[in-house]
């Protein structure tokens, strides 16, 4: 279920403040954030934001196609390592 249109998109105020400060200075540096729920705004395009995935910060370079999506969509929390292999024991039981 999406967010109500009358409320508008959400972005962490501290993150937005950091982005605006960097834009004013013209700097490009990695910004660490734990706010996976923040919506990507046009001001963020061109910046690299390190999004926390529960274990480490994953660097995400923001492009124009990402605007409107959430930061958490680009930092997966689960690592799929594949299903179990067939062993001698499992094939012998059949």
From Swiss-Prot:
For this UniProt record, the keywords arranged alphabetically read as follows: Ribonucleoprotein, Ribosomal protein, RNA-binding, rRNA-binding
Entry-linked Pfam families: Ribosomal_S19 (PF00203)
Listed GO biological process terms? ribosomal small subunit assembly; translation
List the GO terms this entry assigns under cellular component, sorted alphabetically: cytoplasm; small ribosomal subunit
UniProt GO MF annotations: rRNA binding; structural constituent of ribosome
Gene3D superfamilies registered for this protein in UniProt: 30s Ribosomal Protein S19, Chain A (3.30.860.10)
Coiled-coil stretches are: none
Q: Entry's SUPFAM superfamilies?
A: Ribosomal protein S19 (SSF54570)
Q: What does this protein do?
A: Protein S19 forms a complex with S13 that binds strongly to the 16S ribosomal RNA.
By sequence similarity, the record places it as follows:
Belongs to the universal ribosomal protein uS19 family.
Protein name, please? Small ribosomal subunit protein uS19
């Amino acid at each position: 279920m999406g967010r109500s249109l009358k409320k508008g998109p959400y972005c962490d105020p501290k993150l937005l403040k950091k982005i605006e400060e960097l834009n004013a200075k013209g700097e490009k540096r990695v910004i660490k954030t734990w706010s996976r729920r923040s919506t990507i705004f046009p001001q963020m395009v061109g910046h690299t934001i390190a999004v926390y995935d529960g274990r480490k910060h994953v660097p995400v370079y923001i492009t124009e196609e990402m605007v409107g999506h959430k930061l958490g969509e680009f930092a997966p929390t689960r690592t799929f390592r594949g299903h179990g292999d067939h062993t001698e024991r499992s094939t012998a039981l059949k």
